[in-house]
Swiss-Prot record:
GO terms for biological process: cellular response to phosphate starvation; response to oxidative stress; stringent response. This is Uncharacterized protein YtfK. InterPro entries: DUF1107. Gene3D superfamilies: so0334 like domain (3.30.1910.10).
Amino acid sequence: MKIFQRYNPLQVAKYVKILFRGRLYIKDVGAFEFDKGKILIPKVKDKLHLSVMSEVNRQVMRLQTEMA
């Protein structure tokens, strides 16, 4: 499990895209699981977790289109 001390969407997206499957923790935000290069819907479904999931997944998609 990777622990990010700060929330940086691009850095988290690169980690998710490279490892493809696993878990991560963002300090002051919470824990997330990811599979197939995308963050899964979090168990804690508050607005903060959902917005982080959405933003990181958008960054992953952007990174994938840049590579294609």
